[in-house]
Amino acid sequence: MACGNGHNAEGRYAGVAPEAGIVSVKILDRYGQGNSTHAVLGLRWIMDNAHKYNIKVVNLSIGTNDRKVNLPLKEAVERLWQMGIVVVAAAGNPDGRNGYRPPPAVSGGVISVGAWEDRSYFLAPAFPLFSRERDVLPDLWAPGEDIISVLSPDFDFTLPNRSRKNIVDENYITMSGASMATPLISGAAALLLAENPHTRPAEIKRLLLQKAKPFGGLLTAEVCRTI
């Protein structure tokens, strides 16, 4: 979604920044499960190897409901931000509890992303289906419903909100949520950096917010903006 080149899809599906390189850092198990300790270790690996692999943007389509792990994740992403690396994090999905931006999206050193679906625009003043509506709103919203993504051979269909009906073909599947919206913003950040490689993260964030459009019918244009 962020930088797929569409090779496996014969050009039918491509990411926002298809010429960007990908450095995969494994912090989850084969079933997509993990913990904050592994997440922090992964972020520290990026700190140590950012120059070697020319890492400019970090996409974090992860989150936790455990606020006790806030500090180590917050410190790790803010360190990356200070190093000049743009960090883009999913702002979470509603689950019946009080809404808030979960770690690591709660940090000031990130661009936090919520997801919107087409119907949300016409349900004002309701909030987007896939984004938390209280406490702190995401910096940006991006499309997050039925997004086509790569299908892993180990994809666990026994987990909630996963269905074989979403399979597109042997290589692709559609999924929904903030984790799917986040790579779209990461790709947009990569495009900005391709034009101006030395731009600092705060300026990338400012440019994205500046170019985003007010999300019609949701609160005010100042706090609800979408790409």
Predicted regions and their residues:
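Extracellular S/T/G-rich loop segment that most often corresponds to the catalytic His/Ser-adjacent loop
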Residues: 105-190, 194
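Subtilisin-like serine protease catalytic core
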Residues: 1-37, 53-56, 69, 106-110, ...
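Sec-exported extracytoplasmic/periplasmic mature domains
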Residues: 3-7, 44-51, 78-82, 115-118, ...
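Active-site-proximal beta-strand/loop segments in catalytic clefts of secreted hydrolases
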Residues: 1-5, 25-29, 60-64, 89-94, ...
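C-terminal subdomain of the subtilisin-like protease fold in secreted/lumenal serine endopeptidases
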Residues: 55-61, 171, 194-227
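Substrate-binding/access-modulating region of protease and related hydrolase catalytic domains
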Residues: 9, 27-109, 120, 166-182
